């Protein structure tokens, strides 16, 4: 898969406006035209007609080419694979290809927009797999939100892929779908909204702690948002060794006495908030050292930040509007602030994780992506920022650094058993 980069530039006003050219025949010629990012994206998606295309690795220009790529020669690898299905890794694209699977039920901040509307996101994800990790990826949007049907569909599709990246499937269904597929399939199954997010958050926190001079054992951590990302972040922080993690959601602090929790939130209530505190997000943040938000815009106030411990770390990752704007958080006393956005310092973005994770898992023929691999990936990402370059505005590696995917892949491979 690659970008659909045509040599013949389409002659249409939408494309010319998006690319900065003066549209021929535009009635507004001579007038200033300023397009927003959203307008540019829409115009370019119209021009692209999809961000991917199929490209052949082998030329088919002669009769011999045809006989080798297709009949009769293609029968030979088929016969070998029929005797040993593992040979598919040698004779097909299975060894370096993943499926990006979504039901469109929880897409970005757009919610349940369905499989058709989810396709641009899945195409974009596939582009990032290829561009940043060299991994082929195929977007698959399923027209069902039934858990059993999704599990069956992915199981039936699995022979053609070396891994499954689940994407934008709503909680709590996403937890069951991933866990059951991991038990059924012998290839890696990875819900990036959960684990990719958790890995980059942990990487950022590792470096932020170095900047503020605190130890994980001494930190009170508040994770706001008890959906797929919040649950996975909390699990990985606990695995890493943070002893004091409190989850919050719309109901406030999640405790063992909180009513209306789904089954996964109930499980998390058993291993977090060991003091069984109750109250609001403001109550949880009082005396906290670290805040991780994967929730809603503008729900953290300056007063809440001021109530946190000195040199607080805030990752406000709601998109496109974070829980609190970085300048406001800094003015209220926060030391290190990260967001999910590229226009602020410390972008905490999954793109530094998932391409390398799958690259390593595929190259090492891992059957699963384990907790050890996730921790190794987080440490590898953190270590990509040199100690002498670490500061409150530089805790994450640059996504365009070509070393990122390679380093993460090696970290993953080193923990394949």
For each of these PLM feature ranges, what is it?
Residues 9, 19, 24-28:
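Short, low-complexity intrinsically disordered segments enriched in A/P/G/S/L with frequent Arg
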Residues 20, 32-187, 409, 415:
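N-terminal ligand-binding/catalytic initiation module
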Residues 108, 113-130, 195, 199-292:
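Glycine-rich phosphate/diphosphate-binding loop of Rossmann-like nucleotide-binding domains
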Residues 139, 165-168, 189-192, 223, ...:
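General beta-strand structural signal in soluble alpha/beta enzymes
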Residues 266-336, 341-343:
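Rossmann-like adenosine-cofactor binding region
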